[in-house]
Regions:
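Phosphate-group recognition and catalysis centered on beta-loop-alpha active-site segments
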Residues: 2-171
């Protein structure tokens, strides 16, 4: 019984010290921490000292403008261009969560994004393109962008293979 207690106490102490080291490590990798839903320049400037990388929700409009907004039916008339200007001047990376990417607009988006990266001299490696539509997202991957497929389930690792196939078919 003493051995079990000793092992238990040793594990708790070990876990405690591991937590201290892990917490200390968080500050050592600021490039791994992203500011989520940075959908206003005010929020970007407010948190710019702490975060060098940020995620922005965008909708691609009929006039080939990337509109910064979370909801397709809402616009605040904020273009993505100030964000490109910001990372051109200050460094960092930009995660674009595209809310309406599909096979009908992917070519126009690629053209517009190529123009923006060229105009602001931003390498593709500094961007992450996210969408729920894996087929359209594949085109971004083929063009050399880092991509992220959004899966809208709480625990995607617990999905059965049939559920994964069903989701992929719907996307």
């Amino acid at each position: 019984m003493r051995i079990i207690r000793f092992i238990g106490v040793a594990c708790v102490i070990g876990l405690f010290f591991w937590c201290i080291v892990a917490i200390d490590e968080v500050g050592e990798h600021p490039d791994k921490i992203w500011l989520h839903r940075c959908n206003s320049m005010e929020k970007l400037y407010e948190h710019s000292e702490r975060y060098s990388n940020f995620e922005v929700d965008i909708v691609f409009r009929q006039d080939s403008v990337f509109d910064v907004t979370h909801d397709i039916d809402t616009s605040f008339n904020l273009s993505i261009e100030p964000y490109f200007g910001y990372i051109q001047q200050n460094g960092g990376k930009l995660w674009l969560d595209i809310k309406n990417l599909d096979l009908q607009n992917v070519s126009a988006m690629l053209t517009q994004l190529a123009d923006l990266t060229s105009r602001y001299d931003i390498d593709k490696e500094r961007l992450i393109i996210e969408s729920r539509n894996w087929q359209a997202l594949q085109r971004f991957t083929e063009e050399g962008y880092y991509t992220s497929l959004y899966i809208g389930w709480e625990n995607p690792s617990r999905l059965e293979s049939e559920e994964i196939d069903s989701y992929m078919d719907k996307s």
